[in-house]
Design a protein with these regions (language model features):
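Beta/alpha (TIM)-barrel catalytic core signal, keyed to glycine-rich beta->alpha loops juxtaposed to Asp/Glu
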Residues: 136, 140-145, 152-290
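Active-site gating/metal-coordination segments in enzymes
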Residues: 98-154
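A short, structured active-site edge motif that brings together acidic residues
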Residues: 75-88
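Well-ordered, non-membrane alpha-helical segments in soluble/globular domains
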Residues: 27-38, 55-64, 125-135, 161-171, ...
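Short amphipathic alpha-helices and their capping/turn segments at secondary-structure boundaries
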Residues: 1-3, 62-71, 130-142, 192-197
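N-terminal binding-site loop/beta-alpha segment at the start of enzyme catalytic domains
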Residues: 1-72, 254
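N-terminal small/glycine-rich loop or linker at the start of catalytic domains
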Residues: 1-26, 89-120
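Active-site mouth loops of central-metabolism enzymes
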Residues: 16-33, 111-131, 159, 241-246
Length: 290
């Protein structure tokens, strides 16, 4: 994985501390081209990996990229699924059949039959496969080396003890999409232990890691213990800036001290901030001591 990854919160008015800033972002990025312009800036700065939700507008961005395939041939997406709001809105506007037609590839009657039988039988692995295929439809023809399961699902399944679905997810992603499975969680230590117990080897785990403990379940000390341990996992640090509560230098100095952290995910929309964060991550990671 690349050391530096750009996230998408800034494009879809997600700010965990400021509603005012969220509204400003919504206005700025109301046009798809404005998002692509920022991705172009990131590429100019040397960032070629974009970790994003499966928001409908991502499909529009991909459509724009496909008009210039040579330019984006080395660009990588890390899809994060599911995007729950998308399905809730579609059910309201299109109904059940309309939602299936819109998001699930293949013959609608065959898919509906498969989904119906799976639901009646409580065949959750089959339902999961259908939803994965629906979410991945927009990424056809693009580079997707890692495909993530969102924390809203990961942490729910962990809480319910539905461990077998993690194994099925990992196997399906590898087999169907020739990609590595990734897991986003607000409880990194528990996720590491669960993957170890289930035999999911050297998992990619994306979790909030910052010096304030922002959106980190468990103590900072426990996270640090795992990040300096011999446990086999590949952590991606997100929420490093604690939604803007920390300055970049201070935030990245903390995160980048850990040698085990393979990638750092951040959101920014100006050339200056993108370049600043990239330079900090690369420079400070080279000096990692723990």
């Amino acid at each position: 994985m690349d050391k530096v990854i750009l996230g998408d919160n800034q494009f879809f008015a997600v700010n965990h501390l400021s509603d005012e800033r969220s509204r400003a972002q919504a206005v700025r990025f109301k046009e798809d081209q404005s998002i692509l312009d920022v991705l172009d800036v990131a590429m100019d700065c040397g960032i070629n990996t974009f970790m994003c939700t499966t928001h409908d507008r991502i499909a529009n961005i991909i459509a724009l990229m496909k008009k210039n395939p040579e330019k984006y041939k080395d660009f990588k997406f890390h899809p994060c699924m599911p995007y729950a709001h998308k399905y809730a809105n579609a059910m309201t506007e299109l109904g059940i059949v309309g939602t299936l037609k819109a998001y699930i590839p293949g013959n609608i009657m065959a898919v509906a039959s498969k989904a119906g039988i799976a639901y009646v039988r409580k065949d959750f692995p089959t339902l999961m496969e259908l939803l994965i295929d629906a979410e991945m439809k927009m990424f056809e023809g693009m580079n997707t080396p890692v495909i993530f399961l969102q924390n809203v699902i990961v942490d729910l399944l962990m809480g319910l003890g539905m461990d077998e679905l993690f194994v099925h997810y990992a196997e399906y992603i590898k087999k169907k999409y020739n990609a590595e499975p990734g897991f986003i969680t607000m409880n990194m230590p528990r996720m590491v232990d669960m993957c170890e117990r289930l035999g999911i080897e050297n998992p990619i785990i994306c979790s909030s890691i910052n010096k304030m403990g922002f959106r980190m379940s468990g103590s900072i000390e426990e996270y640090e213990e795992y990040l300096t341990s011999d446990k086999k996992f590949r952590p991606i640090a997100m929420q490093c800036l604690a939604a803007g509560a920390l300055k970049p230098q201070e935030a990245m100095a903390y995160v980048c001290q850990f040698k085990k952290i393979e990638s750092v995910l951040f959101g920014a929309s100006s050339r200056a901030h993108i370049q600043q964060n990239k330079d900090l991550i690369e420079t400070l990671s080279a000096k990692a001591t723990r």
